[in-house]
């Protein structure tokens, strides 16, 4: 008999969201994600008790790193970045031993600065012991090409594989796995940088994710959410995440300009795609264009180098419009990322557009500094929200109740709020619950 796969829906969304061990409470009409596990590794999940080493050299994929650091802990695992930080050639970003390494778009892992809590650790790979890890993941980007020449890296992968650890790679991350001799004869996938080799030595499949025993491979960055779930299944047979495609038919508008918080845009975009939602980027011009500081350039850049259009997500997965051209009929929920994106919304008068969307009955979600824009649009009176501490005065002066220390995420009517980058998973579950229950 064919197994019935559970799907997240209006009737079970809160129960599914709480399975990780996060506490979800109802306070009047408010639903809040709260307790000590908010923004931290969760106590329950298929990766519970597992230590996952993520091997990176400079020029790694920022997008993949952002998602893994957000979701390994969400499924109960411990993420530790293993830095190939001694290489002095073939990198295009500063690589300082003892400091960390930098991604292709410039995020540094020393550790990732905007991620608090216990979601990440890091050390030089030379100081790590392969016996300490239940799984190793090698990221894509140019990182794999840089590390493949390093004997210490190849020997580390070989030792972990021989001991029975799971080995995973995304995109070009299979380059060191090929060199370590663990891909021969294996069913696998990958991007064009490894496909031609894998077709000769392995059983290549043009699929998003392929699992062959303890080898897990993903084709590209956009497949990272499915890759993480595939790793979960190798540790817990039969695991299926009910979030897969649960938002099919829903439309999410992400409001963006320069100086947005990279992780708060990248991870929601990747997860919303995984959950089946249609993603629309609504862009507006900033008051000042500081990243890059060039007039007339039609590219928006986050605090840590991610751009719109996205460098690592093909445009077939999302669309972009000028926010002024977006109609309320185009979306079901508008999402505001943090950093200085909300500041620009206020400074440019974009909050007037927000007022119109809210008056039309649309749901609005905001994380980190995002509540500042909600307050400026006079949408928080009588509402209870969470967010970064910098939003406190704005929310309270405009009549809202601000609970950043208590809540990781919250739903109050048509307002969804999230605390900081480390609470992106809770924020996304709150968005999912709100959309399913509307």
Report residues per predicted region.
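Active-site environment of divalent metal-dependent phosphoester hydrolases
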Residues: 166
